[in-house]
Amino acid sequence: MSRKRNIVCSLFVMLLTMSSCSWLDVSPSNEVNEEDMFSKGDGYRNALNGLYLKLSESSFYGRNLSWGFIEVLGQQYLTDFMERTSTYYKAAGYKYDDADVKSVISGFWSTAYNGIAGCNHLIFKVSETDLSVFQEREMERNMIWGEALALRALFHFDIMRLFAPSMETDDGKKYIPYVDSYPVISTTYYTNTEILKKIESDLLQARDLVAKCDIEEHPEWMETSYRMFARGMSSELPEEVFFAYRGYRMNYYAITALLARVYLWEKEYKKAFDCAEAVVKATHNDRLLFGFVGSSELGGDVKDSESLIFTVSNETLTDDFKPFITSDSKTRFLFSGSSIFEGSQEDQRGSSSMVGNQESVQYSKKYTLAEGTDGYDMIPVIRLSEMYYIMAEYYARNANFIEAGKMLDAVRSARGIISNTSNIISLDDFIGKLLKEIRKELIGEGQLYFQYKRLNNNSFADGVKFVFDRPENEEI
């Protein structure tokens, strides 16, 4: 993974030139620095990499939007092992008015909109720059442009999921701004429907832009050995490290998978199905690009790198996670394995290689890999199982419960469950089974809470609040 670390080390170049107090201001310290930064192709590469670093900050996917705060809201962890004065204990009770909880919520907003400002800055620069600046000419320019558009869409989508109601309870009000210009003169707030259309537009354009690299010229880079580890056949490896590790980047299929997630949120179930199916069936040289590791091999690949479509990198992940599973810590992220995995002896996700034990309860081993181990820094954002769940829901909403069950069982079988197939008799029955499967499959990945919210299902906890108030200091 040392080649990827070289990429990550270069990310600080952008951040050092883009520090600012305002969440919509990315002006560098002086114009000379900006002019110098974007005079060469490396400046654009560093700027893009800086956006990924922003995405992986602890205030976003590095912790709070993956295995931390958002998992607490989804009640994945037992509050019995949380100090009563801790931010997480208060968050589990939906005490959004608490100062500590407010700070985390404010961090979501400021991190996202600062990242969005960086996206807009890069999009503005790259769209007007001569192709001669880029080593790989049009392919590289379009790839950078497309990834920046996709990241802008992702930041906005997550802020909408946090600070606006789901489409199940949408009231037509305007909750967040969609900022897509540089420099910013003023901001305009939009309805959920308007925001989703803007997200869709950005993602469709982004996918078209990255297609030349990922689909037309280098489809082999989408295979797991290249996508996650950059160690395929030496003759086909990217000469430049910048083009490696496409699984940590907004590649063509990551954008397609994100579109599937967005369409599902929008209740456009057929569009969501089509995008999810495109990912599930994606091939190169007659081989599926995405799959599941064998259930017997899962213990040696606890994150299932074969099924990862998009991840972020946090090189301090193991150290960040360790205090929350240490036996003498005052706040620990522990769960009841017997409850989540329903006592299954077949489900390898509940095996000792996947979960550790403390005081008769469990913790996830996803983020306990030693530094330097393959994938130790990976935090999954989108994985293959979610695509199967999206396809299953489409079938269920069309009363095709047999096919819906087959989609759920495709993931269950991959995890070792072969003796108990899903027998679905109604949409409500399907939703209940779906939520159970998501809880098992995506522990520590921050998706369960959003599924509850999307479905307006508040049965999992008392006093659930699905919409954050906009931070007081961020009023426009």
Please name every model-derived segment.
Residues 1-30:
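Bacterial Sec-dependent N-terminal signal peptides
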Residues 21-73, 314, 405, 458-476:
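Membrane-proximal, proline-rich intrinsically disordered regions
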Residues 221-236, 242-252, 264-267, 271-384, ...:
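Hydrophobic-face positions in mid-chain alpha helices that act as interaction patches
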Residues 86-163, 185-193, 209-210, 372-379, ...:
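Conserved, well-structured interaction surfaces
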